[in-house]
């Protein structure tokens, strides 16, 4: 396709996840650089300090900082009061000022800094916000310094085979952290700064003996990347350090090497997953006195001379490479040796990042809708969906199949077809003549198959990338979808799209904070506790009919299992009805908008992998911005819950589903990736992606993904708290049979 083809769409409106971008400097205008230099000494002005690396400062006491760190972690802004009383700002260069002295207040985590501005010849005393550890927080961390989660024997670890819940919740260290958090949040001194310490240890955020307490505590936690559960990073041995595959103790003639079979067994049963980092995560839970069991000795003799001091790694998840290294010390010879063994996909059960991304890629599609505002130009509304199951429908022609597709409510909501503050901006379907005119006017830019397909405008469209990028967290020209590659969803058209969704979760939420202008939406009980009934997840299930030839072309790995004994197992379904654990890594992938101006693609495949998460019971603050507008049949009976528009209703729903906030170790998902599935490192489906958090904007090392979990983790939610169970119940009630969730049982 000609590169110009990408732009014949005129307007590409990509359905985007909510992108939350916290800013460090708001309305910070720069004055001319020579204005401050030419200032008089009696010039009026003030100085403020801004922390640009809170990730670092929140790991230290203010009393431990030095001048170099102050210059590295903070910037200073001079507020110049001009003759017309307007204030202009300049970020000071390091040669504009001199730090005279500073004073720490470890009680509240602040730092007072006295700086001298050279051009004004004045000194200014300024105080930071509480961006450092307080004494109280530091004492808490010091208490934990001598506690360890490494409490298991190897035999105990083997008994927890592929059972992460028992592995984590039977650990006395984790149980103690949970107890500490419960005590802390039941006191009245909980605050957002101290709460971070507890979130980093447990990854779960709902505490309180009653609903009122849980509501209050919900606002004492920041739901961001810095509050996730922190997985301990493996100790990496420097590349230049020499390792040996075997070591002979010349005193005893014993030959020592790594116990290869034990390592392979632990890889195979690892409850955390099959990545090299997952293996290191598991070993972190093993008692140090068990380390000698990782050795193989040629002679069955005492190993009193040899001490296993520590475990190190060289790890690359991208390639499934693991070098397991024991630091051993010979007490007789005073010799230290690093004994190692290498593991990969060929000699063990290890997996690489792309194995997870490939699994997602094979089941994921781009969903695209052509709309227009003026009947002349095209908007392409794009989101991501994935195959849940196949519906058994004998009424279909042999060349068609019906699939249950999952995506976000806001992807399939299509409220832009029903409402707009300005009717001139309201989107709509093309009519036949408008689309024919559009094709004629753009004939020089579009492919022949698009030009000849005169009824394409009537259908929801779908597509996949011809090839998955070898590295899914990077954009690749091979992983794009062009406009001409889109196929039709045959049962969703401009005539029947109002009835597109088969399942929208229904939730009630108790213990909420809500704007008073939404008073007709909520109920109040005798204890003055507010609740709402029109809650949901940002999730819908839509039956879609596909042509098998399109499946063959666009989903070849799926086509291979169609109508075989392996088909039912291929479908991901809706998880396993178990609660997600924040200690498990997450993977997601979808089709955000293509950012390469030299590409003909409209969207491209991209993946994201997280390392540690935070579970938010649900968003208890209900605002106008929280509303999910869904245009379709009436979903709720609340007086303000719907509005008749044309043939359908504009339903107003709130996303009160349990959320997961991640720390994206690699990759990030932008506009168009809304609706991407989220799986854990054991290939279990746990939820759906709907928003992004630009955490790097405030100094965090990684951005975040926000998703809804399919199993609720709050006692204040009711209704479809287990999406899988709710869907199976609905399938059975409506006598709908599928390959995975509700198969026909032969009598």
Curated annotation (Swiss-Prot):
- Kindly list the residue ranges recorded as spanning the membrane: 7-27
User: Main site of residence?
Assistant: membrane
Where is this protein localized, as stated in its record? Membrane
Q: List the disulfide bonds.
A: none
Q: Which domain of life is it from?
A: Bacteria
Query: Which keywords appear in this protein's UniProt record, sorted alphabetically?
Result: Membrane, Transmembrane, Transmembrane helix
| Membrane topology reported for the UniProt record | Single-pass membrane protein
An example Pfam family from this entry, by short name, is: Mycop_pep_DUF31
Listed GO CC annotations: membrane
Name the chain's protein: Uncharacterized protein UU030
Q: Native species of this protein?
A: Ureaplasma parvum serovar 3 (strain ATCC 700970)
